[in-house]
Amino acid sequence: MNLQGRTVLVLGLGETGLSMAKWLFRRGALVRAADTRNEPPAMRAFNSLLPQAEVFTGSLAGRAFYGVDLIAISPGLPLSEPLVQQALKEGIPVVGDMELFACAVGGTGGGMPKLVGITGSNGKTTVTAMTGAMLKKAGWDVEVAGNIGPAVLDALMRREDTGKMPQAWVLELSSFQLETTKSLGLDAAAVLNVSEDHLDRYAGMQEYAAAKARIFLGDSEGVQILNGDDPVVRQMTLAGRPHVTFSLATPQSADDFGLLREGGDTWLMQGDTRLMDARELAITGRHNCANALAALALCRALAVPFEPLLQALREFRGLPHRVEKVAAFSGITFYDDSKGTNVGATVAALKGLGQPVVLIAGGDGKAQNFSPLAAPIGEHGRAVVLIGRDAEKIAVAINECGVPLHRAQTMEEAVRKSFQLAREGDAVLMSPACASFDMFDNYVHRAEAFVAAVRSMQAARAGGNSAGVAGRH
């Protein structure tokens, strides 16, 4: 893609938008920017980089689009934006950072670097980090980027500056990024699962799943890695393309990955081959077995030997805010799953802990259907404490779950009530199944509030303010 002298409008001045502006400027484009926010987070950095460039803030204005040859859109802005739709009708290309990256790295020749991509409603950040760690353990020079951070173009520019490209790019891809990506041509691409999420942006599940399936676009004979337990994902199989499945059931073919349960043991398998005992994984839960199997399938698609991959899995400790153990006291264990921002993530967390749970949930529900929470709460739940804007919607959806439902106005109150409701041997799990923006800056801020409340309670108990767990029930 020749950008020299072309007028490009960057839509959105966050981390991704700024990375696109820097990349486009480096390629000789004439850059201007627009953002619906009055004070975009990267505004100062953009003005420092391009002090003469036009910047339009507030509601999008038609004059920002006048005379542009290309639009580089940030993932947070939907293609349904009327002025973007008008530009598309006029034949103006609209791309995102991943498409700019694809055009830059395509045609490098020699089969390197390898391109690996991961998407899914849940688990994609963990599988991306896990895959990167496994390839590094095998001695590969790897760059992990995308939705996980850093922005892929920032990583690419840093590699350009060093004069050394990696052997593999491992990319986390959101559905928002995939909407504007068509040329990646990945050597190995995984769709981990598809469950309700972002239905405030998509017309329905079919449109959302179609965005996820775009990971397989591009001139590629790369391997499809598909969740064999997810019927929506299985339908993404492309005729004539090599594909491998991963599953929590026994593998159905020699190439597929799955689990074998034998006596009290669970084995990670490929075909009939036992790879490792699931108890050797440093991260717990059935969902993390699935994550490990997906990462193995991705790495094996690049013909990496098993030994370093399995060793990396034994060492991988997981990521913050993903069913992360925060504390244990008075016989109760507290888990932070603030990254569980949709129903599917919370269902996986409930099923994965293997102990009775007092669940803290709620927030901005993103137009999801919460009824799938009812069955796992009924099976694993001790009680539910609901917070946030959509607490009542969740309460209505799970009303028949068979466990007590409580309300809290703050995270501190939710933690206090959860502790009172829990029994010895239980877990208190903060897995909201919702976005955080109704009460918090982001999911990290929400996690910090939860951890602070837990630590405060722990300190109070240690200081002698202890009635004993048994005495509370």
Curated annotation (Swiss-Prot):
Binding of ATP, residues: G120, S121, N122, G123, K124, T125, T126
This protein's GO CC annotations: cytoplasm
Catalyzed reaction equations: UDP-N-acetyl-alpha-D-muramoyl-L-alanine + D-glutamate + ATP = UDP-N-acetyl-alpha-D-muramoyl-L-alanyl-D-glutamate + ADP + phosphate + H(+)
Database matches in PANTHER family: UDP-N-ACETYLMURAMOYLALANINE--D-GLUTAMATE LIGASE (PTHR43692:SF1)
Function per UniProt: Cell wall formation. Catalyzes the addition of glutamate to the nucleotide precursor UDP-N-acetylmuramoyl-L-alanine (UMA).
NCBIfam families linked to this entry: murD (TIGR01087)
Name recorded for this polypeptide: UDP-N-acetylmuramoylalanine--D-glutamate ligase
Organism of derivation: Nitrosospira multiformis (strain ATCC 25196 / NCIMB 11849 / C 71)
